[in-house]
Amino acid sequence: MKAVGFNRPLPVSDENCLLDIELPAPELRERDLLVEVRAVSVNPADVKVRAAHTPAAGQYRVLGWDAAGVVKAVGSGVQHFQVGDEVYYAGVINRPGSYAELQAVGERIVARKPRTLDFAQAAALPLTALTAWETLFDRLDVNKPVAGGSRALLLVGGAGGVGSITIQLLKTLTDIQIIATASRPESENWVRALGADFVINHHHNLPEQVAALGIGAPSWAFSTNHSERYLPQLAELLAPQGRIALIDDPDVLDANPLKSKSISLHWEFMFTRALRETADIARQGEILAKVAQLVDEGRLHSTATQTINGINAANLRQAHQLVERGDMVGKVVLAGW
């Protein structure tokens, strides 16, 4: 089968950082689906692994943690899917990814794709939707009020892939006021269109901007990037006993500013359930099914903003360049082989 992989960490400026390769079709485990991949999306996780991971000698690493496609075969223990089902999923970081014509993925972290979306539009959603949903409802527990805090959440990085779906989930499923950060006119317009109630600039003082809104101290904050830079400001502006979640990988993170307010800090890693095979691993498939339902009801929308035709090394390198630039609005997807 066709695939795209890498055999050594190279900068995205090197045309050999991703390579077109041929691999045997994957073998299925008991609960696996064999999916014919029709579309993929690129996330910061792809970029980080490509730039830092060294595969074993003579081996290729296949990235890709967003896909939509068609089930071509099922393992002997599969219970909920059949050949021909159109599905979408993020997968798990310790198995070969979706930059391949065929991918094996456990059925418990898969759902049928939204009927109203094509494969490219659907492929933009899984990783970011799971990240946003788990952050809001499993980590921050936004349905549990913070005593004395305003029903408001500050989202640092509102226009990226995770931020774009976070805003929609909050607007659709809660009555929480959304304060999103954006620093350019196009990103500000994007987050307002998605449903942000207030937009502030993350290059300026956050506590001063939040105070000027006149809505009180927010109960929650969600930092999607540069958390080491923003954490002291989040500690200052949040209500006592508020909650902060983050998804990035700071080299050093000083949490001491949180102590005097008893602010809790929550890490979200979308791969935890599948990587650790937790008892509630099937929740990821359930979340994706709920997201698909909300999309088909017109209450959520794909965050795909750019589609590249053709899943190959050259096009994936282009997509990696867009993501590495750090100013993506929405998601970039690739469709077709």
Residue spans for each PLM region:
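Glycine-rich phosphate-binding loop and adjacent beta-alpha segment
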Residues: 229-300, 336-337
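A structural motif shared across PLP-dependent enzymes of the aminotransferase-like
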Residues: 94-107
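Glycine-rich beta-strand-centered segment in the early N-terminal region that forms part
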Residues: 24-41, 51-96
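Short amphipathic alpha-helix with an adjacent loop that forms part of the alpha/beta core around
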Residues: 205-216
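Mid-domain Rossmann-like dinucleotide-binding core that forms the NAD(H)/NADP(H) cofactor-binding site
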Residues: 123-204
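Short, glycine/polar-rich helix-capping loops at beta-to-alpha or helix-loop-helix junctions
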Residues: 98-99, 182-190, 252-255
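Residue-level marker of beta-strand positions
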Residues: 85-86, 102, 243
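C-terminal capping/lid region of NAD(P)-dependent oxidoreductase domains
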Residues: 299-306, 317-337
